[in-house]
């Protein structure tokens, strides 16, 4: 236990917060072949593999995911939200942060309705998260 005098001389340091999606905070300088600090809310990438994965213990399903090589040359696993998708190898996608709690190693989401990813068909509620246009009545 430090004395008050010791705390006056050197106060307690608060822990620095680690990013939940560290890959989005890296840029890549292809001329110098080195990484740079470049924070961005989303990054563009190309699908290298599209498949399904089984979730952790209490849950049971086949969750859709894509292996994506981002514009900073890092490969990640990204979750494909919604029912049905049109992604295949070499599709260009937009990736945002946000983990999937029951899929180990999946810390990113693919943005529906952006670039090569289509929106979810027939969706009427919560459309903005799934890139669905307003239906004509």
UniProtKB/Swiss-Prot annotation:
Question: What are the start and end residues of every segment in region (Disordered)?
Answer: 1-57, 118-137
Source domain of life: Bacteria
- Mark the residues carrying the PTM 3-methylthioaspartic acid: 102
Membrane-spanning intervals of the chain: none
Which keywords accompany this UniProt record? Methylation, Ribonucleoprotein, Ribosomal protein, RNA-binding, rRNA-binding, tRNA-binding
**This protein's GO CC annotations:** small ribosomal subunit
**Biological-process GO terms, alphabetical:** translation
Task: State the Gene Ontology terms under molecular function.
Answer: rRNA binding; structural constituent of ribosome; tRNA binding
Entries under InterPro entries matching the protein: NA-bd_OB-fold (IPR012340), Ribosomal_uS12 (IPR006032), Ribosomal_uS12_bac (IPR005679)
Q: Which Gene3D superfamilies match?
A: Nucleic acid-binding proteins
Q: Which PANTHER family does this one have?
A: 30S RIBOSOMAL PROTEIN S12 FAMILY MEMBER (PTHR11652)
UniProt similarity note: Belongs to the universal ribosomal protein uS12 family.
Q: What does this protein do?
A: With S4 and S5 plays an important role in translational accuracy.
Subunit details: Part of the 30S ribosomal subunit. Contacts proteins S8 and S17. May interact with IF1 in the 30S initiation complex.
Name of the protein in question: Small ribosomal subunit protein uS12
Organism expressing this protein natively: Staphylococcus haemolyticus (strain JCSC1435)
């Amino acid at each position: 236990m430090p004395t008050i005098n010791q705390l006056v001389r050197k106060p307690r340091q608060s822990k620095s917060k680690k990013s939940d999606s560290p890959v989005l905070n890296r840029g890549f300088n292809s001329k110098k072949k080195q990484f740079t600090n470049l924070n961005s809310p989303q990054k563009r990438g190309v699908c290298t593999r599209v498949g399904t994965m089984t979730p952790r213990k209490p849950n049971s399903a086949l969750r859709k995911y894509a292996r994506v090589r981002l514009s900073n040359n890092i490969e990640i696993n990204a979750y494909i939200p919604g029912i049905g998708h049109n992604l295949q190898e070499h599709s260009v996608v937009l990736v945002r942060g946000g983990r999937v709690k029951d899929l180990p190693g999946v810390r990113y989401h693919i943005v529906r309705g952006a670039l090569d990813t289509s929106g979810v068909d027939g969706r009427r509620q919560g459309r903005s998260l799934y890139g669905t246009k307003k239906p004509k009545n």
